[in-house]
C-alpha cells in the first residue's frame, strides 16, 4: 500500500498546473486554505469538505488507563481530539481504485 506522500509543495504544484496561477500564488493559496481549515478545527468547528471528508473535534473525558509494561493504573486526562471521517464518495473511489489495480494484476 505504501507509496508517495503528497506534500504542500505537491498541492501547490498541482494548483499551478491546473489553475494557471504563478507558483508563488499557488503556494500562497494552498497555505491560505490549509490555515483556514486548521483555524476552524482549533476553534472547535466541524469542517465538512463535500465528497472528501469531515473533520470534527470532540472532547474526551478523564478515564483510567493502564500502563502496558507495568499494569499500573494511570489517569488519562480530559482532552480534545480530532476525528476524520471520509465521505462515501471517497471510500468508493478508493475501493474502485483497489479493485482496478487487482484486476490489472497488482497487489
Curated annotation (Swiss-Prot):
The keyword Manganese does not apply. The keyword DNA repair does not apply. Transmembrane segments: none annotated. Keywords: DNA recombination, DNA-binding, Transcription, Transcription regulation, Translation regulation. InterPro entries: Hist_DNA-bd, Histone-like_DNA-bd_CS, IHF-like_DNA-bd_dom_sf, IHF_alpha. GO terms for biological process: DNA recombination; positive regulation of metabolic process; regulation of DNA-templated transcription; regulation of translation. GO terms for molecular function: DNA binding; structural constituent of chromatin. GO terms for cellular component: cytosol. Heterodimer of an alpha and a beta chain. NCBIfam families: himA (TIGR00987), PRK00285.1 (NF001401). PANTHER family: DNA-BINDING PROTEIN HU, INTEGRATION HOST FACTOR SUBUNIT ALPHA. Belongs to the bacterial histone-like protein family. This protein is one of the two subunits of integration host factor, a specific DNA-binding protein that functions in genetic recombination as well as in transcriptional and translational control. This is Integration host factor subunit alpha. It comes from Mesorhizobium japonicum (strain LMG 29417 / CECT 9101 / MAFF 303099). The lineage of its organism: Bacteria, Pseudomonadati, Pseudomonadota, Alphaproteobacteria, Hyphomicrobiales. The gene is ihfA.
Amino acid at each position: 500500500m505504501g507509496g508517495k506522500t503528497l506534500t504542500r509543495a505537491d498541492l501547490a504544484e498541482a494548483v499551478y498546473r491546473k489553475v494557471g496561477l504563478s507558483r508563488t500564488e499557488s503556494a500562497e493559496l494552498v497555505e491560505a486554505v490549509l490555515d483556514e481549515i486548521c483555524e476552524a478545527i482549533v476553534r472547535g468547528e466541524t469542517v465538512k469538505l463535500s465528497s472528501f471528508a469531515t473533520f470534527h473535534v470532540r472532547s474526551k473525558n478523564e478515564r483510567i488507563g493502564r500502563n502496558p509494561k507495568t499494569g499500573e493504573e494511570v489517569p488519562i486526562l480530559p482532552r480534545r481530539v480530532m476525528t476524520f471521517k471520509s465521505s462515501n464518495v471517497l471510500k468508493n473511489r478508493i475501493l474502485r481504485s483497489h479493485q482496478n489495480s487487482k484486476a490489472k494484476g497488482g497487489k
